[in-house]
């Protein structure tokens, strides 16, 4: 039974992170003698009182905003983190820092998910095709410039140190290249088994999540969303 929409229409929030170092005495998570001591004391506080530093989500604040006044609803999201975040924390750094994520909430780019083999233990081929639509890049450049203006404002002057990956916010070409080099998933994939009417050739399930043309089979996860929502899926 052929359903051409299976594995098509992949959408995800494309995410760009900028980070700055901060002194170790700040309320941030980091790899330093002082930071290790802070965590050790915080663990005891948590065990005794269920309070303190380790109750933090680390992603401590967020914001939704519009890239232009004429945009009807927010199209960019910021998430602030009290730690250095580099390549989803796969790249570790000594010291302390703060980071800010910016996401395109309603991306135009569409990717695919395919299979390599009939063996279910073989990993699938996932191609998000991030930034394949230039509108996403242009919007993320605006978001990157906004996040940089916020973190480089006077409110952070007393704690902000060096930028982990320096880029001039006013240099649009440099910001675009930095985004191409480092932007990645925010882990909100949807769309590869989209819900839709029979008239939609890429629809995989109906309004009751039943797979079209196959009796007794339903899909009940975020892959049935036809489009990505303007916020976290989890």
Q: What does each model-identified segment do?
A:
Residues 22-26, 39-232:
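FAD-dependent oxidoreductase catalytic-site/capping-region signature
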